[in-house]
């Protein structure tokens, strides 16, 4: 997966074989200079396997990705990794949503949209990053393959 907002960041999933854990390698995040295509740095994501679906918040300060045990958040330099959602997802998107705080004030919230790849693959969950809670569920007629906003 790749994020390119102000810099090119590449998420490498490593090797993950659920039947042979001795061959597994941890995932990593690399920063590539977009002008000369040289590696600026690479950081191993400790105890993270099969990382995929890298997305960024609008300010490029926080990154989110899926891995074998759920959805994770990290700083844009690969530090401070924490698990946000503890079920396996293979779809991940972010969105900023507005809402009325009162008659004259509009608030904004960063949302993650994920699926449950194993338990309910026809369901999309909306997760509010500010409150760390699920705030909506969308059920569709078939397995979720992708999420797009228009």
Which residues does each PLM region occupy?
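Short loop/turn segments immediately following the C-termini of beta-strands
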Residues: 13-16, 66-69, 115-119
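Short, solvent-exposed loop/turn segments at conserved positions within beta-propeller repeat blades
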Residues: 17-27, 117-121
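Blade-level signature of beta-propeller repeat domains, shared across WD40, Kelch, NHL, RCC1
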Residues: 117-150
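Conserved beta-propeller blade signature
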Residues: 7-11, 61-65, 106-114
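Short loop/turn segments that connect beta-strands within beta-propeller blades
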Residues: 33-37, 75-79, 128-132
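Repeated scaffold domains used in trafficking and secretory/extracellular systems
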Residues: 1-5, 47-58, 90-104, 142-150
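A short loop-to-beta-strand structural motif that recurs across blades of beta-propeller domains
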Residues: 27-30, 70-72, 123-125
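A short beta-strand motif characteristic of beta-propeller blades
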Residues: 38-46, 80-92, 133-139
